């Protein structure tokens, strides 16, 4: 429980602990025993980071009865009146408990504290080195190597969450997010095991500056190092970057496998060599020495697995060596121009490529009057077809031919856009219908001849023609011309049959007129469908 300053210490004045030495020897021995018990209890409480008030008071054993002050004895604490600071009585009792060592505590004028833990953590007496080499307070003798004397304005920051007043040297109890507990074995405890705690202070011993000055440091013990190694194994070895690196290595090994099949094998099917190599140089050397052989070989055949040559021999060994680069992927001829980065399997291809950088065009057109020049002979050969009218590049889908392969490629795009090719008429083949209605087609367009028709058929044809003319005239807004058109057509059809035919033609004309009057309503619906 927390102690109240009112009933226990009615008046505590400002003074020094220097006159505390007049106590009796028995009181000094009792105070020393209490001091040792408090330090042992404090060390035990530190292992739990002193998280509860009960553990605080149990560790420090603040009992004013054992530390009675004489009426004339003064303390290092200024009286603030009853109830000014709840922890002032406990702080005074703790300071009085130090006995002859209170000279290291000094005066205190900082902000008020809410608990005894706050006072003990902020007090300068804990963690400082004694002049004689003895050390007292929160940190034991094993921790003296990292703690030095501080100025009067300094304090210790044991937990990153607590604010701290520090001087030019800062606190050295926290290193890279870890704090020194002062226990045997140089144990470093981390307030949060796997998360970096952002401290509000800026001092020369921050984590970033320690990393920059000393490189990555592992300040933990063996058990912490093992935990860190296990954490690294679970969180870093399965990173996607490591996976892709592993897959890339496997792909490289897969490409550097010798697939040469020994023709002298007796087994069937024959197996390939399947030796794996780490570098291209090792693979090429193996194939050249073990399989291709030296100049004594007279048969230059490629026996690489699934080779498209299918046992067809080369005339010279160097041609076989150049061919094997197709299988191995070797390209030993890089472009020497900076920034290009292209590599080639054949030296002649590199020679041609370098002309793109130099602009050299040594191959001139051999046709008289043409001054075209080319970087390689194959381009010149393609150009020569323009002068000879030779068109060796034929289209496989039609009968057209071209002098240059680029022209053929452009032509092939036409077939790709219209696979069916050219058609005779869109209306006949593509399903398109004519814009002219079937009933409006002129009789002259019919395949049958009007001279071979009977008078009745001629009259019917005249009536149909009159109806068509009438509909067209109505469509143009000329209603009066429909009858004349019908009469003219009727007279024309009747002229082939003499007088009787003329009468029939007249009837046809009148019939055509009636057909115009009667069929107009029937054709109007068709117009609405065709011309909307």
Swiss-Prot record:
UniProt region (Disordered), positions on chain: 406-452, 475-532
UniProt cross-references to Pfam families, sorted A to Z: zf-C2H2, zf-C2H2_15, zf_ZIC
Assembly behavior: Interacts with RNF180. Interacts (via the C2H2-type domains 3, 4 and 5) with MDFIC (via the C2H2-type domains 3, 4 and 5); the interaction reduces its transcriptional activity. Interacts with GLI1 and GLI2. Interacts (via C2H2-type domain 3) with DHX9.
Disorder noted: Holoprosencephaly 5: A structural anomaly of the brain, in which the developing forebrain fails to correctly separate into right and left hemispheres. Holoprosencephaly is genetically heterogeneous and associated with several distinct facies and phenotypic variability.
Key words, A-Z: Activator, Cytoplasm, Developmental protein, Differentiation, Disease variant, DNA-binding, Holoprosencephaly, Isopeptide bond, Metal-binding, Neurogenesis, Nucleus, Phosphoprotein, Repeat, Repressor, Transcription, Transcription regulation, Ubl conjugation, Zinc, Zinc-finger
GO cellular component, one term: nuclear body
Protein name in the entry: Zinc finger protein ZIC 2
GO biological process: brain development; cell differentiation; central nervous system development; negative regulation of DNA-templated transcription; positive regulation of DNA-binding transcription factor activity; positive regulation of DNA-templated transcription; regulation of transcription by RNA polymerase II; visual perception
Keyword Transcription attributed: yes
Source organism: Homo sapiens (Human)
Effect of residue 152 to F: In HPE5; 50% reduction of luciferase activity; requires 2 nucleotide substitutions
Main location: nucleus
Compartments, record wording: Nucleus; Cytoplasm
Listed Gly residues bias regions: 476-521
Function, in words: Acts as a transcriptional activator or repressor. Plays important roles in the early stage of organogenesis of the CNS. Activates the transcription of the serotonin transporter SERT in uncrossed ipsilateral retinal ganglion cells (iRGCs) to refine eye-specific projections in primary visual targets. Its transcriptional activity is repressed by MDFIC. Involved in the formation of the ipsilateral retinal projection at the optic chiasm midline. Drives the expression of EPHB1 on ipsilaterally projecting growth cones. Binds to the minimal GLI-consensus sequence 5'-TGGGTGGTC-3'.
Glycyl lysine isopeptide (Lys-Gly) (interchain with G-Cter in SUMO2), cross-linked positions: 253
Start and end residues of each stretch annotated as Necessary for interaction with MDFIC and transcriptional activation or repression: 100-255
Posttranslational mods: Phosphorylated. Ubiquitinated by RNF180, leading to its degradation.
SMART domains: ZnF_C2H2
Residues with Phosphoserine modification: 191, 199
Signal peptide start-end: none
Zinc finger intervals, C2H2-type: 256-291, 300-327, 333-357, 363-387, 393-415
Protein family (similarity comment): Belongs to the GLI C2H2-type zinc-finger protein family.
């Amino acid at each position: 429980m927390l102690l109240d300053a009112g009933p226990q210490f009615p008046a505590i004045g400002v003074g020094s602990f220097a006159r505390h030495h007049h106590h009796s020897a028995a009181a000094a021995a009792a105070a020393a025993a209490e001091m040792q018990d408090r330090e042992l209890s404090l060390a035990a409480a530190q292992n739990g980071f002193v998280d509860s008030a009960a553990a605080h008071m149990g560790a420090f054993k603040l009992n004013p009865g054992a530390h009675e002050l004489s009426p004339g004895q003064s303390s290092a604490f200024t009286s603030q009146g009853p109830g000014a600071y709840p922890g002032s009585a406990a702080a005074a009792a703790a300071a009085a408990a130090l006995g002859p060592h209170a000279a290291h505590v000094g005066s205190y004028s900082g902000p008020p504290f809410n608990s005894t833990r706050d006072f003990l953590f902020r007090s300068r007496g804990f963690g400082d080195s004694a002049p004689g080499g003895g050390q007292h307070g929160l940190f034991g003798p094993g921790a003296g190597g990292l703690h030095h004397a501080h100025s009067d304005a300094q304090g210790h920051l044991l937990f990153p969450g607590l604010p701290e007043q520090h001087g030019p040297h800062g606190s050295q109890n926290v290193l890279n997010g870890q704090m020194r507990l002062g226990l045997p074995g140089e144990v470093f405890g981390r307030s949060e095991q796997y998360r970096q705690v952002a401290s509000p202070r800026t001092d020369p011993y921050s984590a970033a500056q320690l990393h920059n000055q000393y490189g990555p440091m592992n300040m933990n013990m063996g058990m912490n190092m093992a935990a860190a190694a296990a954490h690294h194994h679970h969180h870093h070895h399965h990173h996607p970057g490591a996976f892709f690196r592993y897959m890339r290595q496997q792909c490289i090994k897969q490409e550097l496998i010798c697939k040469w099949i020994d023709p002298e094998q007796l087994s069937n099917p024959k197996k390939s060599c399947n030796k794996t190599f780490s570098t291209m140089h090792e693979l090429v050397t193996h194939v050249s020495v073990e399989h291709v052989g030296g100049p004594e070989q007279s048969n230059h055949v490629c026996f690489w697995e699934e080779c498209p040559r299918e046992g067809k021999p080369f005339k010279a060994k160097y041609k076989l060596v150049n061919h094997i680069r197709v299988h191995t992927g070797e390209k030993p001829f890089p472009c020497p121009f900076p920034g290009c980065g292209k590599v080639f399997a054949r030296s002649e291809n590199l020679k041609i490529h370098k002309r793109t950088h130099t602009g050299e065009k040594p191959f001139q057109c051999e046709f008289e009057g043409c001054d075209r020049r080319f970087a390689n002979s194959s381009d010149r050969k393609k150009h020569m077809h323009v002068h000879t009218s030779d068109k060796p590049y034929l289209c496989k889908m039609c009968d057209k031919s071209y002098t240059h392969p680029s022209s053929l490629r452009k032509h092939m795009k036409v077939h790709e856009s219209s696979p069916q090719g050219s058609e005779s008429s869109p209306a006949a083949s593509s399903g398109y219908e004519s814009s002219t209605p079937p009933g409006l087609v002129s009789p002259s367009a019919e395949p049958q001849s009007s001279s071979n028709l009977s008078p009745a058929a001629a009259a019917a044809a005249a009536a149909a023609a009159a109806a068509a003319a009438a509909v067209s005239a109505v469509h143009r807004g000329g209603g009066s011309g429909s009858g004349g058109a019908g009469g003219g057509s009727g007279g024309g059809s009747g002229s082939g049959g003499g007088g009787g035919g003329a009468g029939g033609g007249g009837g046809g004309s009148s019939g055509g007129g009636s057909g115009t009057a009667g069929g107009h309503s029937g054709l109007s619906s068709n117009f609405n469908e065709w011309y909307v």
